[in-house]
């Protein structure tokens, strides 16, 4: 390796010397021509001959160096290929268990076994899906429908709007007093009452709160609250009476 590097440095130095010698003689030849020296002048002939020889030497050395570089490039290509083969053989040696001729047969058998198990799994899933479609679990039974209906009715009862009414009442001095009366549905209780058979029964009682607000001419507000428990069946009558 060191010998090759030294040889390359030596050949590059020789090529540079040939190039410099050619440049010097060529410049001297052109200088004589610019001075009007005849081409048959002995001095011109000597300088021109030296320049031509230097040019030939430079070209020969350049071709030699180029051939040398081409040879070196070829050897590197071959060496690179050899190194590649060595690395490939190393990888194959490490994984030599994968080079078993029976490996392909084993792989095929394993793949068939996997596919067979996947088919069994898919068939099981199809059977489960079919059973789920036959058994309709989306419909509600009577007990569930009754419970759902009760919840809906209770929700509507709790969301009853407030009934409000405002009136204008005259006073003894001829002034007007504003009287506002509001009815609120404040809640629902489940009361247990005994029956004739001795069994308790559940009775829904709704609390109806009536608020009467009186605004006097002098700006004084008076509010009167009245609370009354009523059953759902007479809720509308209570609301009308409170108003």
From Swiss-Prot:
A Pfam short name: Herpes_UL14
Compartments where located: Virion tegument; Host cytoplasm; Host nucleus
InterPro entries membership: Herpes_UL14
Family: Belongs to the alphaherpesvirinae HHV-1 UL14 protein family.
Protein name: Tegument protein UL14 homolog
UniProt keywords, alphabetically: Host cytoplasm, Host nucleus, Virion, Virion tegument
Major localization class: virion
Function: Contributes to the nuclear transport of the viral transcriptional activator VP16 homolog during the early phase of infection. Therefore, participates indirectly in the regulation of the immediate-early gene expression. Additionally, seems to be important for efficient nuclear targeting of capsids.
Any Gene Ontology CC annotation: host cell nucleus
PTM: Phosphorylated.
